């Protein structure tokens, strides 16, 4: 029996838990959170999924978790993630680690965690799951690698700070470049409170460019009243992806694809890790480089507007 830990039993963590329960493997599942209320919700959601080869434990201390763990998913918000990972790896042996985004709100955390992961020999990935979506795998098959990718997404209150890294990740997966330049000239000079207490959000347009000529444009505006969709141009192809409806339109021709939720992906992720020793997500080194490039510009932008002097930036 393999042992899995989910650290963080909030909304996302409980969906990870439901997904993990669908794994084909016999699993001993541990769920850790300081909040008894979150643990109760997670247990309720766990019981909504049927499986006859899983056991589950809900605990409020890492001291109660087995010392040797096959897979760990850290699904907390960004602020406590550094502490959770540091504490966990100082007391437990972890084979495979999956971290939720936004990884960390403080730039120095990235190199420190990188050193710790290398020291402990922990294989680590970051959960930007669009790489696992059937729709994006189909789009990837249409991409001509020698030609640039132009990716545009516009929407209303879609949580730009929180979710930009998802789009950056799949954009980089599609265009094949190693790094990007990030332009914030068209962001609105206002910082608003996030839906999640203690975090912030922004509006406007972000622009990312790569050395191979690819461009990603992301726009979030309170005035938007259209249908959100991704528009991807490459060579002769114009691709529209309506993620929420599971519809992809390629040069006017419709293709239906599944709509993916985390509860439908985490079991697949566990199976890939246990059976292959790898998965389709970006590894820590890749994703951390995207995070650092983004945070290096967005943190000073936000902190200047807010009048903060901290080197940290509350995005999650």
What kind of region is each of these model predictions?
Residues 134-150:
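Rossmann-like NAD(P)H-binding beta-loop-alpha module
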Residues 151-225, 285-289:
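Rossmann-like dinucleotide-binding domain that binds NAD(P)(H)
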Residues 48-57, 119-122:
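A short helix-to-beta-strand connector/capping loop
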Residues 26, 71-76, 272-316:
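C-terminal helix-rich "cap/oligomerization" subdomain common to oxidoreductases
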């Amino acid at each position: 029996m393999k042992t899995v830990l989910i650290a963080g039993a909030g909304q996302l963590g409980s969906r990870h838990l439901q997904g993990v329960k669908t794994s084909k493997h016999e699993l001993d599942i541990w769920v850790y959170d300081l909040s008894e209320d979150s643990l109760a919700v997670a247990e309720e959601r766990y019981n909504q999924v049927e499986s006859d080869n899983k056991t589950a434990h809900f605990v409020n201390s890492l001291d109660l978790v087995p010392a040797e763990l096959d897979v760990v998913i850290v699904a907390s918000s960004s602020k406590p993630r550094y502490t959770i990972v540091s504490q966990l790896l100082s007391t437990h042996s972890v084979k495979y680690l999956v971290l939720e985004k936004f990884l960390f709100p403080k730039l120095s955390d990235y190199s420190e965690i990188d050193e710790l992961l290398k020291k402990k020999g922990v294989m680590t990935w970051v959960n930007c799951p669009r790489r696992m979506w059937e729709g994006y795998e189909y789009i990837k098959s249409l991409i001509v690698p020698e030609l640039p990718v132009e990716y545009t997404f516009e929407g209303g209150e879609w949580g730009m700070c929180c979710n930009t890294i998802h789009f950056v990740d799949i954009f980089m997966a599609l265009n094949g470049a190693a790094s990007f330049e990030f332009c914030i000239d068209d962001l609105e000079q206002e910082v608003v409170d996030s839906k999640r207490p203690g975090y912030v959000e922004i509006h406007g347009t972000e622009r990312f460019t790569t050395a191979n000529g690819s461009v990603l444009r992301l726009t979030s505006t309170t005035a938007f009243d259209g249908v959100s969709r991704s528009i991807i141009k490459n060579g002769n192809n114009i691709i529209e992806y309506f993620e929420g409806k599971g519809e992809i339109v390629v040069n006017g021709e419709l293709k239906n694809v599944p709509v993916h939720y985390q509860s439908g992906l985490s079991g697949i992720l566990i199976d890939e890790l246990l059976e292959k020793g790898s998965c389709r997500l970006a590894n820590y080194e890749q994703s951390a480089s995207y995070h650092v490039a983004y945070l290096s510009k967005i943190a000073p932008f936000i902190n200047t507007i807010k009048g903060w002097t901290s080197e940290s930036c509350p995005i999650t």
